[in-house]
Amino acid sequence: MISYLDNIVFLLAKGHQRAQGVLKGHLNAFGLTPMQCLFMESLWDEDGLSVGDIGRRISLDTATLAGVLDRMVTAGWVRREADPDDGRVTRVYLTDKAKGAFSDLSASIERTNNELLSNFSLEEKLLFKRFLRDVKD
């Protein structure tokens, strides 16, 4: 039987816990959670996405995103509007607050990645990311 110390599920779970903890530490100053930051990152790539499009990009269902969206609207990070061509679709837009925080938030994400991967060579970083993408897919 494989030891839990070599069990990939255990290792991924512990790696995830550490990564989330480091990221939370960097995001505390903004009052954002890692999920909220990921939500905003999808809008930095393309502002005005529908809630469904955001969910597909970050691999979450719209029901899960509803609460995240509500909290982000309340905090002033995003605004929602009905799609002008289809009133059933809600589009989400970054506010000036979110756009103004882009540089600082990007730096926090980069610091998180650098901290987590500080013991890796460039080649190891590239391989690690590829392996994680393969496991995710």
PLM feature segments, named:
Residues 1-30, 94:
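N-terminal leader segment of winged-helix/HTH proteins
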Residues 7-10, 38, 63, 115, ...:
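Active-site phosphate/pyrophosphate-handling residues
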Residues 13-16, 41-45, 106, 133:
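Short, locally clustered residues in the helix-turn-helix/winged-helix DNA-binding domain
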Residues 17-64:
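N-terminal helix-turn-helix DNA-binding core of bacterial DNA-binding proteins
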Residues 20, 70-130:
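Charged, amphipathic alpha-helical coiled-coil/dimerization segments
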Residues 25, 71, 134:
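Alpha-helical DNA-recognition elements
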Residues 44-46, 54-78, 105-108, 127, ...:
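Long, contiguous secondary-structure blocks with strong helical propensity
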